[in-house]
């Protein structure tokens, strides 16, 4: 399991940044609001950011005594990695290297949908995200690692992702199966079995629960 988007605030890297601020070698490794919006963010910019939690994806931390708004997609304890930075990429590749050295054959990319931030976008499953996924898959192939993507998203996004990686989770199956069992109508789940990606991993439940988003309307495009 490789967590692409974030790492613990208790990690040695982030603790070094807290102590040394911009003097830390790891300073570029973590995203702040200003690193994504160097010229400031408008209300529209901030409102357009997709986040699976209430509120904005920032929390206050002091870097060598100076307050900074650190990007946190999930919780204040999970600080987001700048996957564009050399240090951020080196960290992710160190995980791949360790997995390969441990004879792992499959690697799951956790929260990768949030891993590529860009001003003026939703910062979730954007074209930049797909470039990140492709880059990670290329590195996986070099190390003999097959890539499994973990993304809760609109089903058409899942189909698109599946064409670019080795495996995706079939998160749409659990709610559709429950619907069939509770209503007696099997048409929706039967239709899904016709269009689901052939490289999908069957899922019946997860530690996050059963997600309605995976069979709902597109959270980023209400016209769909």
What do the PLM-derived regions correspond to, one by one?
Residues 1-90, 97, 101, 112-183:
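Acidic/aromatic-lined carbohydrate-recognition and catalytic surfaces
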Residues 69-71, 95, 135, 189-200:
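Short, flexible coil/linker segments at or flanking structured domains
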Residues 107-109:
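Hydrophobic residues within beta-strands of alpha/beta enzymes
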Residues 187-224:
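Active-site-proximal substrate-binding groove within the catalytic cores of carbohydrate-active enzymes
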């Amino acid at each position: 399991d490789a967590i692409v988007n974030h790492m613990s605030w208790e990690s040695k890297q982030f603790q070094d940044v807290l102590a040394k601020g911009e003097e830390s070698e790891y300073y570029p490794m973590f995203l702040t609001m200003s690193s994504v919006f160097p010229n400031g963010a408008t209300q529209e910019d901030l409102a357009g950011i997709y986040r699976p939690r209430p509120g904005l994806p920032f929390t206050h931390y002091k870097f060598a005594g100076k307050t900074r708004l650190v990007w946190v997609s999930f919780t204040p304890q999970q600080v987001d990695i700048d996957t564009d930075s050399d240090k951020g990429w080196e960290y992710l590749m160190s995980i791949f290297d360790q997995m390969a050295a441990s004879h792992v054959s499959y690697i799951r990319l956790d929260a990768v949908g949030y891993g590529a931030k860009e001003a003026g976008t939703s910062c979730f499953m954007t074209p930049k995200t797909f470039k990140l996924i492709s880059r990670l898959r290329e590195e996986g192939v070099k190390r003999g690692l097959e890539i499994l993507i973990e993304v809760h998203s609109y089903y058409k996004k899942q189909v698109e992702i599946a064409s670019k990686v080795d495996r995706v989770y079939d998160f749409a199956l659990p709610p559709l199966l429950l619907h069939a069992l509770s209503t007696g109508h099997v048409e929706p789940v039967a239709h899904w079995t016709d269009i689901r990606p052939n490289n999908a991993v069957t899922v019946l439940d997860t530690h996050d629960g059963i997600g309605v988003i995976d069979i709902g309307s597109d959270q980023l495009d209400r016209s769909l």
